[in-house]
């Protein structure tokens, strides 16, 4: 078992990573130890994950003396919206839950983002715990306090920075994850190697097959390394005014794909993979990386069974209209996260639209 701390002064919290954590109530009891007898807890999940894991979590909570209930939501990125957010609010208000309620987000990135935002808003903020069940949420979205819902005009445009009290990662959950969802998570794993840790990228080139066979040691190492990097970055820049923006490699292009094609048609990690190729090609065109480095990035994403192409149905104008709504845009100027090597990246503001178009068009023939 691995344990990592996100250091944010009085808002610091632990990340526990290992196989079989759902079978051990100790991980929940550590978070709930200072709560009341008959502590009210709401577990919020979706219709896919709840039948697999909700009973285990509810059983552990009841063993700890908690008054626990379950809310099941629809499954899919297309449901990360204000309508479903209101369903959560209605459930909490109709149940007369007070400010001392603890909310548990049990699911992937959609559940974590939506439930985290609901926790930030309900009575101006209640405690919540992240229990991520997809690889993408385990290595990325459950850590760092970004919470949000989507708007038809842009992804994650309505949200807040709100940190959980703990993150509990049971790697056994990945045994029930469809391969397409697993691959989507690998896109974020590869991202960490590109932007921050060249040695980890090397390790991924050597050990990718072990991850796909769910080798326990390899999974625990990869998830822990991603969480360590995320924790280090968040501790330095919680609100994304500096280094944290590097975690958005591929996301400016990727969010445009998700918004234009409809949330859920491409998985988030798939869109990030395609966007990473476009960002890397932009770097190559600008002389920031070598041809060999570019080819290594594309080859690893391709080996991971991820899309490296540009969606055929999207024009340059389709990309730009969404990219100009990106949260990194300042004073009307588009800023892109661009790799400057294997293990480093920068936020760069002066890329011409001609270069961006070349990068987008490259992916049509890859």
Curated annotation (Swiss-Prot):
Residues noted as binding NAD(+) in the record, renumbered to the chain: 75-80, 109-113, 133-134, 146, 155, 173-176
UniProt remark on cofactor binding: Binds 1 divalent metal cation per subunit. Can use either Co(2+) or Zn(2+).
Main location: cytoplasm
EC numbers: 4.2.3.4
Enzyme class name: lyase
Keyword tags: Amino-acid biosynthesis, Aromatic amino acid biosynthesis, Cobalt, Cytoplasm, Lyase, Metal-binding, NAD, Nucleotide-binding, Zinc
Gene Ontology biological process terms, A to Z: amino acid biosynthetic process; aromatic amino acid family biosynthetic process; chorismate biosynthetic process
Domain of life: Bacteria
Catalytic reactions of this protein: 7-phospho-2-dehydro-3-deoxy-D-arabino-heptonate = 3-dehydroquinate + phosphate
CC terms in the record's Gene Ontology section: cytoplasm
This protein's pathway: Metabolic intermediate biosynthesis; chorismate biosynthesis; chorismate from D-erythrose 4-phosphate and phosphoenolpyruvate: step 2/7
Gene Ontology molecular function: 3-dehydroquinate synthase activity; metal ion binding; nucleotide binding
Residues binding Zn(2+): 188, 251, 268
Subcellular location field: Cytoplasm
Cofactor list: NAD(+); Co(2+); Zn(2+)
Protein family membership: Belongs to the sugar phosphate cyclases superfamily. Dehydroquinate synthase family.
HAMAP family: DHQ_synthase (MF_00110)
Free-text function comment from the UniProt entry: Catalyzes the conversion of 3-deoxy-D-arabino-heptulosonate 7-phosphate (DAHP) to dehydroquinate (DHQ).
Protein name: 3-dehydroquinate synthase
Organism of derivation: Vibrio parahaemolyticus serotype O3:K6 (strain RIMD 2210633)
Lineage: Bacteria, Pseudomonadati, Pseudomonadota, Gammaproteobacteria, Vibrionales
Gene name of this polypeptide: aroB
């Amino acid at each position: 078992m691995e344990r990592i701390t996100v250091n944010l002064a009085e808002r610091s919290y632990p990340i526990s990573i290992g196989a079989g954590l759902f079978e051990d109530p100790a991980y929940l009891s550590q978070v709930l130890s200072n709560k009341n007898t008959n502590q009210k807890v709401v577990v919020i999940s979706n219709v896919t994950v709840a039948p697999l894991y909700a009973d285990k979590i509810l059983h552990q909570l009841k063993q700890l003396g908690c008054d626990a209930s379950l809310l099941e939501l629809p499954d899919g990125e297309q449901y990360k919206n204000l309508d479903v957010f209101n369903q959560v609010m209605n459930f909490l208000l109709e149940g007369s839950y007070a400010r001392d309620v603890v909310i548990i987000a049990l699911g992937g990135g959609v559940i974590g983002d939506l439930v985290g935002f609901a926790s930030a808003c309900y009575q101006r903020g209640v405690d919540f715990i992240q229990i991520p069940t997809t690889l993408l949420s385990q290595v990325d979205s459950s850590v760092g306090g970004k919470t949000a819902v989507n708007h038809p005009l842009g992804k994650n445009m309505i949200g807040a920075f709100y940190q959980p009290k703990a993150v509990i990662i049971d790697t056994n959950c990945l045994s029930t994850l469809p391969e397409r969802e697993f691959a989507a998570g690998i896109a974020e794993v590869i991202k960490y190697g590109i932007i921050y840790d060249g040695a980890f990228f090397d390790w991924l080139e050597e050990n990718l097959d072990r991850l796909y066979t769910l080798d326990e040691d390899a999974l625990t190492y990869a998830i822990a390394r991603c969480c360590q990097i995320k924790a280090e970055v968040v501790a330095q820049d919680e609100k994304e005014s500096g280094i944290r923006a590097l975690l958005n490699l591929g996301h400016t292009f990727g969010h445009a794909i998700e918004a234009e094609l409809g949330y859920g048609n491409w998985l988030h990690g798939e869109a990030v993979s395609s966007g990473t190729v476009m960002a890397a090609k932009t770097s190559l065109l600008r002389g920031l990386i070598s041809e060999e480095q570019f080819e290594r990035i594309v080859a690893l994403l391709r080996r991971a069974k991820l899309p490296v192409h540009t969606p055929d149905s999207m024009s340059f104008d389709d990309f730009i209209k969404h990219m100009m709504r990106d949260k990194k845009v300042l004073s009307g100027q588009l800023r892109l996260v661009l790799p400057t090597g294997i293990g480093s990246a920068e936020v760069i503001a002066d890329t011409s639209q001609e270069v961006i178009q070349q990068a987008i068009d490259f992916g049509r023939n890859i």
